Each structure stands twice: as C-alpha cells, then as structure tokens.
C-alpha cells in the first residue's frame, strides 16, 4: 500500500511593499521559503519579516 501525502507543504512568502515601493535600498523582491501544515492553516499565510530590499520589517504574504 502506498503512503498518503504528508500534511506539510513548502510555501513562498513575498514582501508586499517591494512591488509598489520605488524608493528602495536595492532593486528586487524579498522572498522567504517556509513550511505550513495544510490541515491546520488552510488560508494564505501572512507574517511580518525583515525585507533586505526595503531595509525594514514588512508583511510577507504567501504566493502560489
């Protein structure tokens, strides 16, 4: 018998301010990879993390 897939998946978090902000320290978009449990957290994740491009803590949202 085959084992079922695990509940944990790898997701990518992207800075929300990098897309619209033109006065940044450096060009580009900040992205972090992390894991989430699909069964416990069904909605999209949003975490405040440090963005090296904006040089401050910003909201990072889960992208596909």
Swiss-Prot record:
Coiled coil: none annotated. Signal peptide: none annotated. It comes from the Bacteria. It holds the Pfam family Ribosomal_L33. Gene3D superfamilies: Ribosomal protein L33 (2.20.28.120). One of its GO terms (biological process) is translation. One of its GO terms (cellular component) is ribonucleoprotein complex. Keywords: Ribonucleoprotein, Ribosomal protein. GO terms for molecular function: structural constituent of ribosome. PANTHER family: 50S RIBOSOMAL PROTEIN L33, CHLOROPLASTIC, LARGE RIBOSOMAL SUBUNIT PROTEIN BL33C. HAMAP family: Ribosomal_bL33 (MF_00294). Belongs to the bacterial ribosomal protein bL33 family. This is Large ribosomal subunit protein bL33. It comes from Synechococcus elongatus (strain ATCC 33912 / PCC 7942 / FACHB-805) (Anacystis nidulans R2). The lineage of its organism: Bacteria, Bacillati, Cyanobacteriota, Cyanophyceae, Synechococcales.
């Amino acid at each position: 018998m085959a084992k079922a897939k695990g509940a944990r998946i790898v997701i990518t978090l992207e800075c929300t301010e990098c897309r619209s902000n033109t006065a940044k320290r450096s060009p580009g978009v900040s992205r972090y990879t992390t894991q989430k449990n699909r069964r416990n957290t069904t909605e999209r994740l949003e975490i405040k993390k440090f963005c090296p491009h904006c040089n401050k803590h910003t909201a990072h949202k889960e992208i596909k």
